[in-house]
Amino acid sequence: MPITPLLHESVARFAATGADITTRAEPDLFVSIDPDHLRRILTAVLDNAITHGDGEIAVTAHARDGAVDIGVRDHGPGFADHFLPVAFDRFTRADTARGGRGSGLGLAIVAALTTTHGGHANATNHPDGGAELRITLPTPRPPFHEELPRITSSDTKDPNREHDTSDQ
C-alpha cells in the first residue's frame, strides 16, 4: 500500500494541537501492512512526539534496503538513557514527573504491529537534541512468476484414442 497519503492524513489529524509538523517523504513508497495498522502506528508515534516534544516535529519517510524507513523526531528533552532499552515494553512511561498522560501501551502497540508485519521499531536520542522514533517496514515483494515448461502436442496423449495393442 502507498504510505504517503496515510502519512499526510495522520499528520493532518494532529494539526489542531498547534504543533509545527513538517513532512518529507519520497514519492511512491509502498509497504506491506494493513492500512489500519499503519494508521495506529503513525498516530501513536506522532502522539508521543507531541506529548514529549516542544511542538516542533519532523516526519520523514524514505526507501532503504528493501524497506521503508519512517522517522518521527521531536525537539524536546529526548529519552532518559535508562528508558531507551525498554521504550517499547508494555506499561512503560517515559516521564511521569511531567504529569504525562497515557497507559504506557502506545509504543508497545507500535512495536507489536511493526513486528507482525515483518518490520521493527527503535527509539534513539538525536545528537542535536530531541527523541526520534524510527519504524522500518518491508516493501512488497514483486509477484512471483514461474516459467512453466512448454508442452507440445507430441508431449500429450489423446485419452480418446484407442490404445494400440498391435505389439502385444
From Swiss-Prot:
PROSITE patterns, per database record: HIS_KIN (PS50109)
CDD domains, A to Z: HATPase (cd00075)
Protein's GO biological process: negative regulation of phosphorelay signal transduction system
InterPro entries: 2C_sensor_his_kinase, HATPase_C_sf, His_kinase_dom, Sig_transdc_His_kin-like_C
Region: Disordered, residue numbers: 137-168
Alphabetical UniProt keywords: ATP-binding, Kinase, Nucleotide-binding, Transferase, Two-component regulatory system
SUPFAM superfamilies the UniProt entry points to: ATPase domain of HSP90 chaperone/DNA topoisomerase II/histidine kinase (SSF55874)
UniProt catalytic activity: ATP + protein L-histidine = ADP + protein N-phospho-L-histidine
Composition bias, Basic and acidic residues: 143-168
Domain Histidine kinase: 1-141
MF terms (GO), sorted A to Z: ATP binding; phosphorelay response regulator activity; protein histidine kinase activity; protein kinase activity
Documented EC number(s): 2.7.13.3
Record bears the keyword Lipoprotein: no
Additional free-text comment from the UniProt record: HK1 and HK2 are merged into a single protein with a distinct N-terminal sequence in strain CDC 1551 / Oshkosh.
Chain's role: Member of the three-protein two-component system HK1/HK2/TcrA. Kinase that binds ATP and catalyzes the transfer of a phosphoryl group from ATP to HK2.
Subunit structure: Interacts with HK2.
Name under which the protein is recorded: Sensor histidine kinase component HK1
